[in-house]
């Protein structure tokens, strides 16, 4: 109930009748209290723009969405195994969509690359036999993963991969206005059918003279829908599908096991750039750090990755997050301690945000910094390994980041009451 009221309050305060005032006051509802609390709570760090104005366009557009304008704002997130279950991204997505409008689920990969790969507030799955590839744990020789670092392939006639809007009653995700799916065209590629709500819309021959990521977009009446890809013959490789509506917030939660900047720069750079350009993010967030073991290499690789991002998305805002603390592997019977390197990694990544003149949010500090992981593990916010975060921590992080985002928007609206109005 609290979440429903959160969105309703925003609608009343922010989306006033434009006929009465071409630029009515915009009140940003920054919650006074957190729903997710713990004895380990600390002050939530603010979002910092080290470029001074690098995030201006993003917050301007966010204010336009808040004012009820017919605008779709896209956010992309890259994370490691802690993001593969979509729980942190899902919490952020859900809270932002309840506040600003549901713009669609965003990207979800076809197939099940990990047993726990289940996105929030959307339904998806496969039937029949599929091979799932990803750039870190299950690589494929040709390196064709598209921009999300994952793919699924089947040569079994009748095998399906599908995605569907959330079940009725879900807080968000129950409607979609378009599906844009991606697949691999290549020599000796197979054929597949595209079904919308049980009706065959297309039969696609994926054979081509050279390997290439291709896209198919299907517009539908805004509402509940199901997209199914059905293998007819030959080998078919799929990447993913983006579910969108005409306005509101859409958030792509991309998580790959053991992801780090080095692995991302080892992807086919043309595929990565093309995919990012097509998704056209207004804000791209990079959250990795748990799987970075060479700070020196990190400092040489991260600039390469940021250059790729900026070339693919010249108008976007960018933000780095520090990674959370985690428990160092100890001998059996010893008291768990934090991995000392994570304190350095947080500091190093902050320096990179300063160097690149982009946005920064200190997740490491938001969870209590060095020494916090053993406490969170003991209180069961982390999984038993002390490395992977659990559902309560996913919700905890997501709520605090959204709080920081709303707080930053509120500060900007206080400074410029006409933020988001037509100039």
Residue ranges and their predicted role:
Residues 268-269, 325-423:
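Catalytic His-Asp segment of secreted/periplasmic serine-dependent ester chemistry enzymes
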Residues 9-18:
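Hydrophobic h-region of N-terminal signal peptides that target proteins for export
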Residues 74, 82-304:
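Conserved SGNH/GDSL esterase-like catalytic core that processes O-acyl groups on lipids
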Residues 1-6:
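Bacterial N-terminal signal peptides that target proteins for export
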Residues 99-111, 321, 363, 412-416:
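Surface-exposed patches in mature extracellular/periplasmic domains of secreted proteins
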Residues 19-26:
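Cleaved targeting-peptide boundary
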Residues 28-77, 133-136, 148, 157-159:
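Membrane/wall-proximal cationic-aromatic binding patches
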Residues 55-56, 68-77, 84, 88, ...:
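Conserved, compact domain cores that house catalytic/ligand-binding motifs in diverse enzymes
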